[in-house]
Amino acid sequence: MAGHSQFSNIKHRKGAQDAKRSQKFTKLIREITVAAKQGLPDPELNPRLRSAIFAARKENLPKDKIETAIKNATGNVAGENYEEIQYEGHGPSGTALIVHALTNNRNRTASEVRYIFSRKGGNLGETGSVSYLFDHVGLIVYKAEGVNFDDLFSHGIELEVLNVEENDKEGLHVITCEIKDFGKVRDAFYAKFGEPELARLSWQPKDLIEISDKELIDKLSALVEELEDNDDVQYVEGNFTFVDKL
């Protein structure tokens, strides 16, 4: 019986992993579709689409699915229309979160996001309820192993970006710029250093809260994980980071 139980657990775990992978593919396809609809179908002329395709390839989304998503978005194929919506809310202990969604039913998504917040010790707020705690900037991220920091820094100075910094913990180089300059800066870095790991508009906290309490870390992790598990939620940003106790 023990062997049977173990096999069942393995099957259950694989089923859960397959479901997560399928959900991730769905979200990637949705982002490709929206990016292609909003701009040109050529990724070299549509940076958002280029970034979406790059992210999809990293996750091994099949090429035919990428091509079909672009074709459906730019052709006369009847399909669902998605809109970008941003939700703001508080997590446990007054933490602040901004939730980014692509949805074809804003009432459904709002209801589900509100339910997750309340179930996990937080509450969904009105527009503007937490965004004042953040700066809205352009964000460009490169892996540290692939690009020399000094070269990035020098290029950033030339382009008059807000900041270029090293994130040693994550092994990343992070560039931020003014919203109005984002397109120009993103394209200039792409031309010199290739496709970044991430390039999008982002809400960066004015004051980052460092959290070391294990119970609070667990609560916030559970909240963010459940939000990002929602089919309509693309990603979540917050004003906190987890640190180890000394």
Swiss-Prot record:
A biological process from GO: regulation of DNA-templated transcription
Residues annotated as signal peptide: none
Xref: SUPFAM superfamilies: YebC-like
UniProt region (Disordered), positions on chain: 1-22
Main location: cytoplasm
Gene Ontology, cellular component aspect: cytoplasm
Compartments where located: Cytoplasm
Keywords for the protein's UniProt record, in alphabetical order: Cytoplasm, DNA-binding, Transcription, Transcription regulation
Disulfide bond keyword on record: no
GO MF annotation list: DNA binding
NCBIfam families: PRK00110.1, PRK12378.1, YebC/PmpR family DNA-binding transcriptional regulator
Family: Belongs to the TACO1 family.
Protein name: Probable transcriptional regulatory protein WRi_002620
Organism: Wolbachia sp. subsp. Drosophila simulans (strain wRi)
Upper classification of the organism: Bacteria, Pseudomonadati, Pseudomonadota, Alphaproteobacteria, Rickettsiales
